[in-house]
Every structure is written in C-alpha cells, then in structure tokens.
Amino acid sequence: MDARIVFLLIYMCLLANNHAQITISNTNPYNSSNHLINNVLLGGGVSANNVTYQGDPIQVGFFNAINSNLGIDSGIVLSTGDIIDLDPNFFGFGNIPSSTNSDPDLLNIANSVPPLINQPFNVTGIFDVATLEFDFIPNSDTLSFKYVFGSNEYLTWINSEYNDVFGFFISGPGITGPYSSPPGFPNGSINIANVPNSIPPLPITISSVNNLLNSQYYIDNQSTFPQTISCNGFTTSFTATTVVQCGEIYHIRLALADGSDANLDSWVFLEAGSFSSNGSVSVSSGIANND
C-alpha cells in the first residue's frame, strides 16, 4: 500500500479519536419527557413537576457529544426535524415531523430581531414547533442552565425570512413579561435566550449570531473535518440565567420552531445537569406523566 495512503488513514483515525461523533437516542427511557427533565436536565437546587412535551416524538431526545466540537458533553436536544439527522453516520433523510405550525410567542420573537439588527426581513409563519415545559421550585435566588443553538439555515439564509427561532419563556413571582404564560401565572413571561450583554436584549437566531454579527459566538461547522455533528453551524455554549425567588413556583417553556417554512432543521442542545439553582436537588415524586 502506498505510504501516503497509510499516512492518510492513520491521520483520519487520529482525528476520529480526538473528535468523537455525536450519538442520539429517543428510545426508552429517553422517549419520556419526565425522564429527560428529571434524570438528564435537572442539576442542583431545583425540584420539578407537571412536565409536558408538545411536538412529534422524533423531535426530542438525548444526545452524547463527549469529545465533539459542540461544546456540551450531553443532554437534551430539541429539533425542528428528526433528531436522527444530527448523526454524521446516518445516511438518508429522517422522518418529517407532524407537529404544530403555530406559536405566537416564537413568531413575535422572530420578528423582533430584524429591527434590532437593522435588517428589513419579515418572518411570515412558524412551523415544526417542539416545546418542553414544566413547573419548578428554586432553592436560591438565581436560576441558570447551559445551551447551544444550531441550524442548517446557516449561512445561506441569515438575514432572511427563514429566521428559525427558539425561546426560553419563564413566568412566576416577580416576573412580568410580554409573552404568554399558563393559568396560575397571570403576569406573562420573559424570554431568557438572548445574546450575552445585549441592550436591549437580542434574541438568539441565525440572523443575530453568525459569521457577520456576534461572530465571537459562532462556530462554522461546514469547514470542520471530519464532522462530529451534521449541522452547518452552531453557537458557542451560552448560559441562560434569571433572578427568581427562593421556594416559589415558576414555570418554564423551552420552545423551538422553523421560520417561514418547514425546510432546513434547527436544534437547541440543553446541557445535562445544568438546570440549577445553587442548592441540593429535591425532585418531586409526584411528577405528572404527560408524555
């Protein structure tokens, strides 16, 4: 065998070992939203109940990305398509989700971005919505968790109507916001998925974080070889944080959708064990089974 071919094979093996490919699962127990929240997402100092998921089952699951370039080792993934499409070893096309094509809060967020970045586009609709939501009680005065946003809309469709969008909507004591909130939380909700230190807050979409704007937070995955994850681009890991009142009940809705059409998927990756409030964890045993 040609020495150059041997060298190339060795080099590719070394790359593969240094950058392990992502693995995805939505089979038991990762097909349970209760398991994903209580056994994957929750960290210290929070208890959770009333867990619900809305969307196609193919749009949510568990990921393991240890030694990949994602920036998060493992956790929950939400997708606007079939999560299997993230696997570089999967050849073909995943199933098309049969999920809701409406979410006023996400549409409002998507269309709040253009004037904030001096762009003229307008998002005409919302498609392939996936949401995880639950009530929680924090054990301190701060809530935080880590996440990454990725999309195959990068970079072709930045600053266009195909502005895929997500939001982390939190409601509860001390919070008054413009977005919807469930019964029992009458003062609306706020979105805590924003570009760090942006004033006014700039929601994270493909048009607000990319190679041209806030580029310090953008990773171009198309130039990566070998790819550890089938995604054109993604953000660096962010920390969502907000002030809360210790011992009070709050509600959070984690939502993701395609903008203007159902083509080209986007994802939100939530780091395992990062949803925390600086205390010892006490998970409720009375969580409703709303899978």
What are these regions (language model features)?
Residues 1-25:
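Bacterial Sec-dependent N-terminal signal peptides
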